[in-house]
Amino acid sequence: NDLAAAWAVDRRGGPLFPVQGSSPRQREMSLRGGVNLVAQMSAEERARGVIAASTGNHGQSVAYAARLFGVRAIIAVPHGANPGKVAAMQALGAEVVFQGESFDEARLWAETQTVLHGYRYIHSGDEPLLIAGVGTYALEILEALPDVDAIFVPIGGGSGAAGVCTVVKALRPQVQVIGVQSEAAPAAYLSWKERRLVSAPARTSAEGLATGTAFELPQRILRQHLDGFILVSEAEIRHAIVLLLEHCHNLAEGAGAAPLAGLLHLKDHFVGRRVVLVLSGGNLSLEQLRRALDGG
């Protein structure tokens, strides 16, 4: 099956199916949200141009959709953003502007520009059409693996996980959806646990998880549908990167490797069960890969 590759953990686990967001076919996983949103924008909104803040993945989605529909796109990224992701956004025609030292600082700048210039701001979380678009890949998971027991998803802002939850719980409510976030950027986890929006420092090296503020719409969906939510360490994420490369020959970035790190936390609970890991991207810099291979 081109959607999944079977793999066993510790020789004791059930079949694992890493759904790849870094292969040519599955790369569209991270693009669907932006495409669905821009496709349904009015002509007036498109004429204004779009602006977004991103550490890379959301920005690529917006840039791709903007190019597809001939819309001007401005993407605010923090200084130190993944060079590969920045280059990808620029190659897609987006105007990339470096602002601030974190995603949230870049986001605040983008929101200010929206007020000043009238752009259509595309929020990375509080966009129903974005969440709906991202969630479509869960349809493919359920079609390809009708007997799946659980799906592990990475969570930064939570839009991807919210999309998966929405689809899975509507069609196959018995399937568990487990969210995984870095303990070095726990805003979404803390918000889910405390049932209120909270902020927390985002110090993770996994830029796809580096969100310091939770968002209202994804949190509302996650509180209703997410079966579990765990935090993993930076070391566990790096270890998962190496495992995926060594055993699956998949190059996963930190956010993409987080689901495996989460499963290893809970492996005794999932022995003998069919589990899907959403590998949400393979945009790993050479320095990040070197650090993972060095174990530091």
List each language-model region with its residue ranges:
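PLP-dependent amino-acid enzyme catalytic core
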Residues: 1-296
